[in-house]
Amino acid sequence: MNVFDEILQPTVVNKCLHGNFTSAEREEYVVARTNVLSVFRVSRAQKLVLAYEWKLAGKIIDMQLLPQIGSPLKMLAILSSKSKVSLVRFDPVAESLETLSLHYYHDKFVNLSTSSLKTESIMAVDPLFRCLLVFNEDVLAILPLKLNTEDMEIDEDENGIKEPMAKRLKRNQGITSDSIIMPISSLHKSLKHVYDIKWLNNFSKPTVGILYQPVLAWCGNEKVLGNTMRYMVLSLDVEDEKTTVIAELADLPNDLHTLVPLKRGYVLIGVNELLYISASGALQSCIRLNTFATSSINTRITDNSDMNIFLSKSSIYFYKALKRHDLLILIDENCRMYNIITESEGNLLTKFDCVQVPIVNEIFKNSRLPLSVCGDLNLETGRVLIGFLSGDAMFLQLKNLKVAFAAKRQLVETVDDDDDEYSALYGESQNNTHTRIVETQEPFDISLLDSIFNIGPLTSLTIGKVASVEPTIQRLPNPNKDEFSIVATSGVGRGSHLTALHSTVQPHIEQALKFTSATRIWNLKIKGKDKYLVTTDADKEKSDVYQIDRNFEPFRAQDFRKDSRTIGMETMDDDKRILQVTSGGLYLFDVDFKRLARLTIDIEIVHACIIDPYILFTDARGNIKIYQLDSKNKKKFIKFKLPEALNEIIITSGSIFKSNICNKFLHGLENSSQEQLLFTFVTGDNQVIFFTEKHNDRIFQLNGVDQLEDMLFISTYQIPEEMNPDPSIKQIMLNRLGHHKKEEFLTILTFGGEIYQYKKSTKHSGKLLKCKSHPLITGAPNNAYPQGVNKIERVAHYFPNYNGYSVVFITGQVPYIIIKEDNSVCRIFRMTNIPIVTMARWGKNSVMCVDNIKNARVMKLDPECYYGNTQILRKIIIEDVVEEFETLGNIAYHERTGMYIISYTKFIEYQALSEDGEPLVGYDPSKPNSTGYKSGLLLINPLTWNIIDRLDLSENSMVNDIKTMLIQLNSKTRRKRELVIIGSSFVKEEDQPSTGCLLVLDITEVVAEPGKPDSNFKFKQLFEEEIRGSVNAVCEISGRFMIGQSSKALVRDMQEDNSAVPVAFLDMPVFITDAKSFSNLMIIGDSMQGFTFVGFDAEPYRMIVLGKSTSKFQVMNLEFLVNNGNINFIVTDRQNHLHVLRYAPDEANSLSGQRLVHCNSFNMFTTNNYMKLVRKHVEFGSKTSNYIALGCQTDGSIFRMIPLNEASYRRFYLVQQQLLDHEIPLAGFNTKMERLDNEYYHKGHSLRPTLDSQVLKKYIHLPITKRTTIENRVGRHASTELWHDLIDIEFSLRSLTNSN
Amino acid sequence: MSIVHPDTSKYEFNFEPFLRKEYSFSLDPDRPVCQYYNSREGIKSCPNGARCPNKHVLPIFQNKIVCKHWLRGLCKKNDQCEYLHEYNLRKMPECVFFTKNGYCTQSPECQYLHVDHKSQLEECEDYNMGFCPSGPACTKKHVKKVLCPRYLVGFCPLGKDCDWSHPKFKVPSEHSKLRIKKDEHINTRKMDEERERRLNAIINGDILVT
């Protein structure tokens, strides 16, 4: 059975809100990315800084902020799938989400609805927060809220006589009353096919506006039926469940889809027109946006059809009621902004116009399909956050939006010269009202303040070399040698690009050196310059000094202790002194290594920490000593008096940190944020204790750290009566991590190699909260994974400035880096693909790393990468000087040459021509054309990411699939060659039968063009055939290849003369969507009827149907999942489910395998676009190769599906059950319901579901006591096995880095 | 093993014996045909029976005419059908019309093999060796090739997979117009004299060397 693991978090911002959710003082944005809820704060530099992030168990479909009684903070109403509403507030004590109430509507909706429900409901909140509605298809739920005290008073006035306020409060102390659930027709019997439903402003009772169409019509039957769209305003009496129709409008255009309530009226948005309806319900004006707009509407019509705007349903709007008028901005799917100007005198509309906002700086060049907009905006200035499906979410500053009005005004002025209107609009606040020259005004300005990284929608992926193209860098082996990355195509339109996902940091190598053997190095900076490099070899008891600026010449320092092991090296006293700590004592030198002082210690020193002027060291017996440099002459060591209690404690390590974490407990510093020196120690029983410079024998401790509790707090240390030393904490660090905005973190490194992090609470000083967001497993406790920590010692190093980032490095056989971007949580990544023994800072912001084979490299962080997601992401933009390629669709990697093949699709105007090139009957050249496509192939060299060859297909063609595969060219020799197989189809109108094309290409080496050394490969076309039927999928099968042409699966064989001859075929029910092969077994997915499992045999050629799925999935993608000699299939369908089926001829009800056994179904929160099989890395034991499936999705996330053996599955299942039973789900999102509840639940085995690693990984972050409870339930010695299983999941993609 | 194109053909499935028994189907499509199996006598003719790792070609594949019902997915006789259930265009006979006329009226849809006899011409040996005296008038195919520089210097690690040509040293056949001359045929006394004369002329300054 399998586990589902998300390896890349979603990046598409699908909903954002502006308001105070966690802090009343700071401007905050609440952002939802599928299932990740983040709160960003606006920093002083106008950047978005992440304050909190929670990963929920389900998708956030919609959310709204609601006021909270008695608190300046707002609460959140979250709508999730299955029409569930959670009311959530921020809990300032635990700094987490607190669920206030949960409302489930799905079951009731199913009972009441007469048709099948939509997957996503609509939520709307009353502007006065009296109630909230959830609507789906034809059913409606109204949830009365008790949030607004003023509103309650109004209510009381109205209903006061019948029901006194006090009584009502007693009856229900909560914030909500009972929900009312009903079919929409019970509001009014004519209501049917509702398009939009919104609460309206300015009514004393909750009132809704409904846009609906009782008789469905479209442009095909419009002439017969006419305009059938209707609009109705209904006032609701929630108490008595009565409704009153306030206004009704009929015969509206059929393309209306959205209703926007304004302060004094409503705007109805249609694809081709905008309508204005007054508050009393009279249609007052209409703007024609293009030539398709309806002409049969009886109102004042403004003709803007030359603007050629199409406002499809995916366009979004931003509305804000300003003092004098309404601000309504529409953003269409191509990210053009329009300002809708409405002016009215009383109820009479005086002006209704649509103006395009003049954006000159092409800020939205790479953005398409906006999803959500929020912010604070007025005519002068303002900031908005816009989330896009394609392109980074943008945090924008808008200045002088009024110019958008003014530009139009000038135009009006020339027509009817009427500036009274203008002054009425802007009033006195407008200084230059009477100056008629537009140039004197400040121009409209839109600028980007910050952006949230987005790589969605991911359309296809492949595995290929990106950073490992060059085998050597600076004459040393590439630190990422033989490493493969995942390369995906992302985005739509002009913002489309490639994304490379690195599982390790791939640094820039500035300098590379061959080294003598060294176990540790130090770089001594004198006057801001790298001066001396000190190396030591612990095995040979040797130390050396080299001069960096003199080409690493050995420095003849006579006083320097060369014959012993150096423990620590540091410059002191403003770089005037150099201190060397050897295993035998302390030595103080001046800058030329002349000895000034010496202090010999009898017992061997094992660890030292030097922070000017203090020297802390521990000896082999576990004693601690602190010395201080004499403050006058800086030539003497003075012993620092330790608290007495310290002598009785067993100490394992000690360091000095600067922090203000315990200022609250220090006399005179209660309110100061000044950083203090903290002498910090880890005791034998894993307590962290510390004291300050003026300690007065007072020691503090971090309570709860020994059990790794969720929250640590500072208290005075009491020596325990009994102490059982069982050290597990190896090293701790307390320092600031981040980029521009740094935050304080406590990093704990254990002997087992695990990394735990705690973040300092921003609200309560002296409290630390555990970081639980998507961890990377680096080790395991109780010696469960000794392979991780042996060979090379793991030591954490802190670098305050590594390319601007404050980071922690951890050396070892597998080195790690802990890095934090401002708009993300702390992330742990693997640092390069080589072991790192030691490191030292280098230059201004680099690091020198020494590996186990004595190579030293100066590494710099790749600035093009983004380190804020769970994998390192790099955007690669494919550009040609002359033209843009727009959407990049498919990608394949040609292994023999190391080249990438990418398909592009450009939008062109569709010419409705018949087969002989004549315009079709009814073709109107005056109207705008529909969109057609033109596509082609690009050959990309990953060295420079330049296009080195291209192949353009004809107009209206669309590449559907590209694969590279090993094809047998000669049936006798069976020599295989890697060829590129491309399937495409022609997109034409529905009267013509679909046709497609099959292309077989080879990539050949040619002599590079002069000046372009990367252009040494070219496409060579081997075979091309036009095919009746669209070629949707191509797939390798035992040296031949299968193409899916519409409903026929055809296996073709390459002949010696490079022609591809059909050798076998199989008919599929409707339309082949995807096909995959494993050995000579194949699965072919159908768009309507599930999929078929087929065996292929050659000479005689046969395609034997071995099994079929019994459910009629609408297959999107499928993949094999092979484990322990069994075959499973994973299928994703159009409803965003992921099904696991199995070929089990032994099973009783499988009709000897002909029915594929349905194992389980799993909900994904977004559409899967592509799946690929990858060999699994085996960390423990068995040599048999297993495979995992990788999939990429529309919301920018990538998942992997990992098969498990029976024993690990059972262990995990128990752990998942335990965790789900005992942990309170965040925001009321129940994992089981969100992931497993679907219509297929009863078909599978309910006790053997696909597991969710998001739940399993919570185990890692449980406090030790809770972990032990779970382990005991799972079985004896379960701890080691559980950690092995977890590591096995985590490392399953290491096959990319250790490919050989 | 390649991570980009994982080799899955060696994987052993638990259900393989079942497939062999039920469909006489095994996981390597290019496995050899069983020498013992006789399709008329059935499974008993092979000593390994259903467990035989080699191919047992069913009697249905001895037929020559493709079943028209099977082509439409309607044949109910399955393996017992007296017609052929295989759609292999490699085995189609040559299109008579095309061979005769050089084109076919059914062109894209014609199911018969369209063999372009020009492409089946032999490669011209002389041309491959460097020069064909007949030039364009040669009846054989002249295929332009790029010499592999690695091969020319001595060794090409790619071997057969190399994109460029690896010409072999070949003694021209008797029919070829090219001959390898023996040394004495080339170094005649007449030529020596001529060379000496030219050398002397250069030394004497009669001919200017440019």
From Swiss-Prot, chain A:
Matching Pfam families: Beta-prop_RSE1_1st, CPSF_A
Record GO cellular component, one term: nucleus
Subcellular location(s) of the protein: Nucleus
Keywords: mRNA processing, Nucleus, RNA-binding
InterPro entries to which the protein is assigned, alphabetical: Beta-prop_RSE1/DDB1/CPSF1_1st, Cleavage/polyA-sp_fac_asu_C, RSE1/DDB1/CFT1/CPSF1, WD40/YVTN_repeat-like_dom_sf
Domain of life, source organism: Eukaryota
GO annotation terms (biological process): mRNA processing
Primary location group: nucleus
GO MF, any single term: RNA binding
Keyword RNA-binding applies: yes
Function description: RNA-binding component of the cleavage and polyadenylation factor (CPF) complex, which plays a key role in polyadenylation-dependent pre-mRNA 3'-end formation and cooperates with cleavage factors including the CFIA complex and NAB4/CFIB. Involved in poly(A) site recognition. May be involved in coupling transcription termination and mRNA 3'-end formation.
Family: Belongs to the CFT1 family.
Annotated protein name in UniProt: Protein CFT1
UniProtKB/Swiss-Prot annotation, chain B:
Coiled-coil region list: none
Keywords: Metal-binding, mRNA processing, Nucleus, Repeat, RNA-binding, Zinc, Zinc-finger
Record GO biological process: mRNA processing
Location of the protein in the cell: Nucleus
SUPFAM superfamilies on file: CCCH zinc finger
InterPro entries assigned: CPSF4/Yth1, Znf_CCCH, Znf_CCCH_sf
GO MF annotation terms: RNA binding; zinc ion binding
Zn finger limits (C3H1-type): 28-59, 61-88, 89-117, 118-142, 143-169
GO CC terms of this entry: nucleus
Record function comment: Component of the cleavage factor I (CF I) involved in pre-mRNA 3'-end processing.
Family: Belongs to the CPSF4/YTH1 family.
Listed name of the protein: mRNA 3'-end-processing protein YTH1
Species this protein is from: Kluyveromyces lactis (strain ATCC 8585 / CBS 2359 / DSM 70799 / NBRC 1267 / NRRL Y-1140 / WM37)
